[in-house]
Amino acid sequence: MALGKQAKTLTKSQVDAVTAFLLSRRNGLRDQTVFLLSVRAGLRAKEIANLKWSMIMTPEGEVGDAIHLTNAASKGRSGREIPLNKQLRENLIKLLMAAQQDRHFHPALSYVVMTQRSAHTSPQAVVNMFKRWYNDIGLLGCSSHSGRRTFITNAARKISTVGGSLRDVQMLAGHSSLAVTQRYIDGDDEARKKIVDVI
């Protein structure tokens, strides 16, 4: 993605607004979970569409503590393990309970994101969902990649506070190099203003 064409990142208040907005809609739990998979786990549209319950569930049939994204579900060899954010995990538990009511549900085969017409949605359908949501809420310049960029930017800003490095952010993002990860990270004007007085 060229630098001038990158999707915008979301502020905390925008994330909160989208989260609340989606929950108020007809397929609120599913839609909010799709959004959280982007903004709290950094998944691409393709990865959200290809995410199966088997990548999230423990052998006991419960939602685990991480997403075990396979290479087949990802872009190239971008399979990885992503620890689950608390809010996202709670949503997945509720979504799993609803999915298990469907007589066609099978933990190894069923996809997390389904529509009324299909048991497996396409990456383009996920892209279209995000476009519709952002248009409905009035967020210009945002796309299905905005949540992923927000996740990567926030992780990069906070990773050192938990003893990690940009290499950990790279691994969470599933990037082949640090250079790719760095292109995703938004700068912070306030931080740049403050740092010159600290050094």
Where are these regions (language model features)?
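C-terminal catalytic core of tyrosine-transesterase DNA break-rejoin enzymes
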Residues: 36, 40, 150-175, 183
